[in-house]
Amino acid sequence: MGSKAKKRVLLPTRPAPPTVEQILEDVRGAPAEDPVFTILAPEDPPVPFRMMEDAEAPGEQLYQQSRAYVAANQRLQQAGNVLRQRCELLQRAGEDLEREVAQMKQAALPAAEAASSG
């Protein structure tokens, strides 16, 4: 009977995490249009509600709050759509990667069998 114990696969050691200085250097070197900076940047920042209370009548205040809410809701919907699209891209890339790994394994298997029997 064959052994039921699985062979343990030795993984390479992980690289050390980046230092704070390296992270800051990367962030400073990133262009302003990098998605890290643009994905959540508000187009029209809402007026703080405390300022509106002092300056405007209650009806106008509610109107401005409603406008700020609608604008924030639109930004959230747009961000959700962007995230959905990027998620789909990542899923497709993952599927492609899995297919390519399977193809490489199939291509490597006959070569490994030939080497072990030869």
From Swiss-Prot:
Taxonomy, superkingdom: Eukaryota
Coiled-coil segments: 81-109
Pfam family of the protein (one): UPF0449
Designated name of the protein: UPF0449 protein C19orf25
Keyword Ubl conjugation recorded: no
Originating organism: Homo sapiens (Human)
Alphabetical list of InterPro entries matching this protein: UPF0449
Name of encoding gene: C19orf25
Similarity comment: Belongs to the UPF0449 family.
Residue numbers of Phosphotyrosine PTMs: Y63
